[in-house]
Amino acid sequence: MGGLAALAREAGHKVTGCDAGVYPPMSDQLKALGIELMEGFGVEQMQLKPDLYVIGNVVSRSRLPSGEPKFPLMEAILESGSPYTSGPQWLSEHVLQGRHVLAVAGTHGKTSTTSMLAWILEAAGLEPGFLVGGVPLNFGVSARLGKVAAGHARNYFVIEADEYDTAFFDKRSKFVHYRPRTAVLNNLEFDHADIFDDLPAIERQFHHLVRTVPGLGRLVVNGLEESLTRVLAQGCWSEVRSFGAAVSDFSAVGEPHNFEVLRHGQKLAEVKWDLGGVHNQLNALAAIAAAEHVGVEVSMAAQALAS
């Protein structure tokens, strides 16, 4: 929600926000943008009379042991008939519409892979917009609009795509709102036991995301994940590029900090960087495969990761 507020501010809106508590680094970023933050969810905030309330999924209709609403501001919004929407819906309508969206989904590695992909596109001169669930050091902000030109071929937005539900009034996963042309399915394990009964329930949500990718789009899928194989088995209508496994379209040979990127056994590039761990090696392959879909050569992507 902090990144969304930053995007709205960059777009020229006056933005205020509230939460139970706001902490660095996001609080510092929002303060620097001139976004006023209020603690708590009191009804006195109705006096601001905004054009629109954007509701985060932390908000609910639940009540305290005393019987009082836990989120009195939300109750006042509903009683007054004030306009409201969810964060993902606002993004879809005001930021993502008409853009080539590159979405990064998965149980793990979303923030890292989204940051890598955005940086690759930046290094390639594509000036992407992005929304990341953290503050990447190489950008210094969690979100920006990027180059926006209606109908322009280079009009990209990279977004961290979460499978958690959208809002108390919209129980679909957030990522179904984003309608990506390029979607990374990084991995898939059981998570969010508060809203999902089992792994198949999450797999169904991931397949909902797959359904939104157009025929000329691309799915970048971890070939090591049986759960993602099951997701695609439910139906797939787009080009698929796999990564990770030896027989994948994109694989790696070497140590995680110094490895060759292969396509069907043929060397395409070499990545030398300070990051370690096989997980980051896989994240890099995913970002490289996604960037290729928008015309970034693998060698250029590898150079960007090294920087």
What are these regions (language model features)?
Residues D19, V135, S142-R144, G244-G254:
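Short linear motifs in intrinsically disordered
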Residues L48-P50, A153-N155, E255:
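A short, glycine/Asx- and small/polar-enriched loop/turn
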Residues G56, F190, F196-H207, G217-R218, ...:
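Adenine nucleotide phosphate-binding catalytic loops in nucleotide-utilizing enzymes
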Residues M1-S86, W90, R218, E226, ...:
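N-terminal leader/targeting and accessory segments in enzymes
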Residues L7-E10, K31, Q45, P65-G223, ...:
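Phosphate-binding loop of NTP-binding sites
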